[in-house]
């Protein structure tokens, strides 16, 4: 069992978060998809295919987060104070700017990219894209409690990439700031405290600190580092799949 003091847990998580950020920079940030997006040279067809797959991913990952309360109910009942930070993210995802939440801006940015609501939400995912939500579903359903929470540390580097998306869409692809709001809002939500709530990344780290204080047992093959950095590889595969399918 790995059991740490609060300062030790915070240091451990900071190190893992830094590894996650580095892996993201080494993988996602160096894809042809992101290079061409930042330069305004990514084909619109590729961008649309990415967004259709991303639109199918979003409801899944949000539902996985809400299911965490049921799957990990024993932990939240034992640590009632953490229900507040957990609920902050639920309110953000499903209540801002009003119910049903972020899915509204997901659809509005999709519309600005020339996609219908059905294309954004109901498109079959490419196998290379399907791997990302299936990884999270596997951890929430089959894994130890900490595995899921370590696996969402990638929200912070994703939030930084959202700024790249926002800049590219408004500078090179003719979208207004309102049109591209899915990415600006997620840059804000994932990387900084906002609306008197913790950033999504801070919510995750708060839960992980408590888990490490109370002790975790790792399954063979599912170390904290593996769970934390693998989503960067899967996001790269997601982008590569969309790029290769349109070239």
Q: Which residues are covered by each model-predicted region?
A:
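Short, charged, low-complexity loops and linkers
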Residues: 2-13, 38-51, 141-146, 181-185
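Acidic, carboxylate-rich catalytic segments that either coordinate divalent cations
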Residues: 3-4, 200, 204, 209-247
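Active-site-proximal alpha-helical scaffolds that flank and shape metal-associated catalytic sites
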Residues: 12-15, 19-22, 84-188, 233-237, ...
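Alpha-helical bundle segments that constitute or directly flank the non-heme di-iron/ferroxidase center
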Residues: 22-26, 41-75, 146-165, 232-239
């Amino acid at each position: 069992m790995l059991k740490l003091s609060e300062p030790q847990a915070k240091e451990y998580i900071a190190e893992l978060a830094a590894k996650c950020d580095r892996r993201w920079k080494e993988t996602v940030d160096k894809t042809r998809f992101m290079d061409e997006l930042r330069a305004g040279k990514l084909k619109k067809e590729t961008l649309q295919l990415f967004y259709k797959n991303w639109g199918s991913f979003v409801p899944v990952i949000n539902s996985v987060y809400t299911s965490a309360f049921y799957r990990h109910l024993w932990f939240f009942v034992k640590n009632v104070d953490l229900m507040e930070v957990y609920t902050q993210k639920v309110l953000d995802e499903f209540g801002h700017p009003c119910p049903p939440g972020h899915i509204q801006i997901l659809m509005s940015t999709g519309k600005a990219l020339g996609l219908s609501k059905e294309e954004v939400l109901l498109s079959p995912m490419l196998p290379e894209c399907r791997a990302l939500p299936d990884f999270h579903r596997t951890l929430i359903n089959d894994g130890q409690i900490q595995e899921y929470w370590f696996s969402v540390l990638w929200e912070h580097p994703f939030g930084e990439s959202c700024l790249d998306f926002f800049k590219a869409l408004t500078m090179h692809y003719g979208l207004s700031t309102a049109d591209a709001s899915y990415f600006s809002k997620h840059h804000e939500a994932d990387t900084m405290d906002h609306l008197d709530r913790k950033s999504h990344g801070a919510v995750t780290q708060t839960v992980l600190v408590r888990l490490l204080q109370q002790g975790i047992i790792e399954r063979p093959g599912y170390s904290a580092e593996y769970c934390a950095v693998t989503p960067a590889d899967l996001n790269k595969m997601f982008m590569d799949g969309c790029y290769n399918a349109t070239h």
